[in-house]
């Protein structure tokens, strides 16, 4: 049986300042670094060993992966970074303070933008300082692929090809896999893995730095789920 560990990145600087982050590349906070290291210690304590690691193109997830692997003496394992595991793109909300945005547009509207499965936030303009239109890490993508806004449905649609082409084949080969990514890209994976409804998935919370361990049988059916904590 194969295992998959999902870790949402540790607290970021913008989690701390209560800003919409999305595809903006912000760093871990001091607390976030400690959360990532703690995840690695828990992984080691539970004897989890990995054959392959995946993460996004964003620093907060990459560093979370590296801290966790270093603490568990597995920094050497193969690692693949992909834009498909990036956080959901929050469009024109990126960079805005969540409290200020709620005061401007109303709590209900902001809640819909954040939590609705199908509703898109306002699209970001290419000349916005928080747009990724000219970010060279996406230079090899067709320009129309780089999003201007995403909801969870769109996020799931871009995560799934990577699951089908890379993650699922690894698990079917009996490999143990670790993924360090983001609240919404991991929520999308969780929706698929656990067959969660469109309505119920919006209430799922992913704690920063908490390893979630799935055990699969040889047909990729989940036989166990465990959250690692003290």
Swiss-Prot record:
InterPro entries: His_Pase_superF_clade-1, His_PPase_superfam, PG/BPGM_mutase_AS, Phosphogly_mut1. CDD domains: HP_PGM_like. Keywords: Gluconeogenesis, Glycolysis, Isomerase. It catalyses: (2R)-2-phosphoglycerate = (2R)-3-phosphoglycerate. The active site is at residues 9, 87. Substrate binds at residues 8-15, 21-22, 60, 87-90, 98, 114-115, 183-184. GO terms for molecular function: phosphoglycerate mutase activity. Pfam families: His_Phos_1. The keyword Transmembrane does not apply. The keyword Isomerase applies. GO terms for biological process: gluconeogenesis; glycolytic process. Its EC number is 5.4.2.11. Disulfide bonds: none annotated. The record marks 182 as: Transition state stabilizer. Pathway: Carbohydrate degradation; glycolysis; pyruvate from D-glyceraldehyde 3-phosphate: step 3/5. Belongs to the phosphoglycerate mutase family. BPG-dependent PGAM subfamily. Catalyzes the interconversion of 2-phosphoglycerate and 3-phosphoglycerate. This is 2,3-bisphosphoglycerate-dependent phosphoglycerate mutase 1. It comes from Lactobacillus johnsonii (strain CNCM I-12250 / La1 / NCC 533). The lineage of its organism: Bacteria, Bacillati, Bacillota, Bacilli, Lactobacillales.
């Amino acid at each position: 049986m194969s295992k998959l560990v999902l870790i949402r990145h540790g607290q970021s600087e913008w989690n701390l300042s209560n800003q919409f982050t999305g595809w903006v590349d912000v760093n871990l906070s001091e607390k976030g670094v400690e959360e990532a290291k703690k995840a690695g210690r828990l992984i080691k304590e539970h004897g989890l060993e990995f054959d392959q690691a995946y993460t996004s193109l964003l620093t907060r997830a990459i560093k979370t992966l590296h801290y966790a692997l270093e603490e568990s003496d597995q920094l050497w394992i193969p690692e693949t970074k992909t834009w498909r595991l990036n956080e959901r793109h929050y469009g024109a909300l990126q960079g805005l303070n969540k409290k200020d945005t709620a005061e401007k547009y109303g709590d209900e509207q902001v809640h819909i933008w954040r939590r609705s499965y199908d509703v898109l936030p306002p699209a970001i303009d290419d000349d916005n300082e928080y747009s990724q239109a000219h970010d060279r890490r996406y230079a090899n993508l067709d320009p129309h692929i780089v999003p201007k806004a995403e909801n969870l449905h769109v996020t799931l649609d871009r995560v799934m090809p990577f699951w089908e082409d890379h993650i699922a084949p690894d698990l079917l080969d009996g490999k143990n896999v670790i993924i360090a990514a983001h609240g919404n890209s991991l929520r999308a994976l969780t929706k698929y893995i656990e067959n969660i409804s469109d309505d119920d998935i919006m209430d799922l919370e992913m704690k920063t730095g908490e390893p979630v361990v799935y055990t699969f049988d040889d047909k990729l059916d989940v036989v166990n789920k465990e959250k690692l904590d003290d």
